[in-house]
Amino acid sequence: MNKETYKKMTGFLHSHPTQAKIVITTNKIITYAIYLAYPCLLLWLIFHNGAATLLEGRIDPLLSKAILVPAVSFIAVSLFRALIDAPRPYEAFALPPVIAKDTKGKSFPSRHAFSIFVIGVTFLAACPLPLVGWLILALGVCLAVVRVLAGVHFPRDVAAGALLGIACGCLGFWIV
């Protein structure tokens, strides 16, 4: 994305408050919904098969993976992005984002995109309703688009976050 594209995209939203509000609200709703859904999955795993194994002094392997895969991956991605410390579009182009944000750097990869995609894969692996996992992955695409439209990430940031989230989830659940 170049400065002109960024300026047109965010400029349109800045001059159309209703559309800007839709972008901001969509970002919040998807983010909060997923961060609410994930603990619900963990609780379901605890009460469905984890409680019996805990009483026996063991930990259910699926519950362990559902906790450890996203957690370890999240920490690794956070360290990686702090090391890379890529500027955000609003820093690079000195233009205001649509979503109020003043974070400096740490744009690549997008942690929002990473998180929703690794959680989507976690649902695919651990939830008895695979449709929920696919829905979360579809919401991940929406969130990635919203983060770019809002001017807080470059397309490469959300693409890398999505790919890393899927890769870490698949690696953690089906390969390791």
Residue ranges of model-derived segments:
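N-terminal transmembrane-helix/juxtamembrane module of multi-pass inner/ER membrane proteins
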Residues: 1-39, 50-54, 61, 77-105
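Membrane-embedded catalytic cores of phosphoryl/pyrophosphoryl-handling enzymes
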Residues: 97-176
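Residues at alpha-helix boundaries and the short loops/turns that link adjacent helices
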Residues: 16, 32, 70, 74, ...
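Structural signal for the C-terminal ends of transmembrane alpha-helices
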Residues: 43-52, 126-127, 174-175
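Generic, well-ordered alpha-helical segments
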Residues: 34, 55-72, 111
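Membrane-helix interface segments
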Residues: 18, 58-62, 89-90, 128-133, ...
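Hydrophobic alpha-helical transmembrane segments
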Residues: 30-46, 72, 135-138, 143
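Alpha-helical transmembrane segments in multi-pass membrane proteins
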Residues: 65-73, 77, 161, 165, ...
